[in-house]
């Protein structure tokens, strides 16, 4: 199960009734934060999402409405008692920006691992943290994160998250591979085990892969020909909808954003299950007034709202 909360749905500037766009995902008690504009940690308190268990922070681009909340959040996480490493993923230039923020944060009780302009990452989800791993034929990860270069006025990344479902234990396979019963439970947890100088791996006892959960996120971009393939068959596609009406197309083109209808067209082409719009212009008072524009193209389109929660379950 993946729990997804929209911490904010605004673009450009924080408004009294709308925080800046940010999303937090919770999987097995560990969290991933997508973007961190001014006021994000306030919304986290309002929604009770917690700070200490944030392992990965994904930044789409370096405009203030997506990153100005980061210094304060990093400080708060430090005050929460966290000592485990945090990964910050972002576009080209993210390291320089974080280094600047750290001038105001001379001491953090945890390490920051800044991953700049990367395209494909794999993580294991452990009880106390998520951990970056290198895959081989013997070990499978719990989570893959892929990025895509978008079309905005500054370097910008889209994100696609694949949550892998744990494979079922296969007793016949374990016996065939002569795996001692005392290590079965650890191998089922995808751990590597040594016993009597012999190494055992999870592939020796686990069955075939099962369908997981895919969530994709693109914000602050014009439509590109690569997006539909990148988001293909996502269970949930979170996309910017800065402008509700096609009458604002000239603004969308000039400012390198999207209209509701353009986002819906990407969702349709990508054959996603559900589209959730976010990053609304301050000029939009009620995004739901414009949702018909998206549904004309892709029926399962929804205008997100601050604090909205979506639960994505594994399917058999």
From Swiss-Prot:
Family matches, as PANTHER family: ZINC PHOSPHODIESTERASE ELAC PROTEIN 1
UniProt keyword list: Endonuclease, Hydrolase, Metal-binding, Nuclease, tRNA processing, Zinc
Top-level lineage group: Bacteria
Similarity comment: family membership: Belongs to the RNase Z family.
Annotated protein name in UniProt: Ribonuclease Z
Organism: Clostridium perfringens (strain SM101 / Type A)
List of residues binding Zn(2+) 2: 65-66, 220, 279
Enzyme Commission number(s): 3.1.26.11
MF term (GO), any: 3'-tRNA processing endoribonuclease activity
């Amino acid at each position: 199960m993946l729990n997804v909360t929209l911490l904010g749905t605004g673009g450009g500037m924080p408004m009294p009734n709308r925080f800046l766009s940010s999303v937090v995902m919770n999987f097995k008690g560990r969290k991933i934060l997508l973007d961190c504009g001014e006021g994000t940690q306030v919304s986290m308190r309002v929604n009770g999402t917690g700070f200490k268990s944030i392992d990965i922070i994904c930044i789409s681009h370096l405009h203030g409405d997506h990153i100005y909340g980061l210094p304060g959040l990093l400080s708060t996480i430090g005050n929460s008692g966290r000592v485990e490493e945090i990964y910050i993923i972002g576009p080209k230039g993210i390291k320089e920006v974080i280094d600047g923020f750290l001038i105001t944060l001379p001491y953090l009780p945890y390490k920051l691992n800044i991953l700049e302009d990367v395209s494909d990452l794999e993580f294991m989800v452990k009880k106390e943290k998520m951990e970056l791993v290198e895959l081989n034929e013997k070990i499978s990860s719990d989570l893959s994160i892929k990025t895509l270069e978008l079309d905005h006025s500054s370097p910008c990344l889209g994100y696609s998250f694949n949550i892998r479902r744990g494979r079922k234990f296969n007793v016949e396979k374990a016996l065939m591979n002569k795996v001692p019963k005392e290590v079965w439970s650890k191998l089922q947890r995808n751990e590597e085990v040594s016993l009597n100088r012999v190494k055992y791996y999870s592939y020796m006892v686990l069955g075939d892969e099962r369908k997981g959960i895919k969530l994709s996120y693109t914000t602050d971009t014009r439509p590109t020909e690569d997006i539909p393939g990148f988001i293909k068959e996502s269970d949930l596609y979170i996309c910017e909808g800065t402008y509700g009406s096609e009458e604002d197309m000239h603004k969308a083109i000039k400012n390198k954003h999207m209209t509701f209808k353009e986002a819906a067209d990407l969702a349709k082409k990508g054959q996603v299950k559900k589209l959730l719009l976010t990053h609304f212009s301050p000029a939009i008072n009620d995004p739901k007034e414009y949702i018909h524009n998206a549904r004309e193209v892709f029926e399962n389109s929804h205008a997100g709202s601050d604090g909205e929660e979506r639960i994505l379950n594994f399917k058999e």
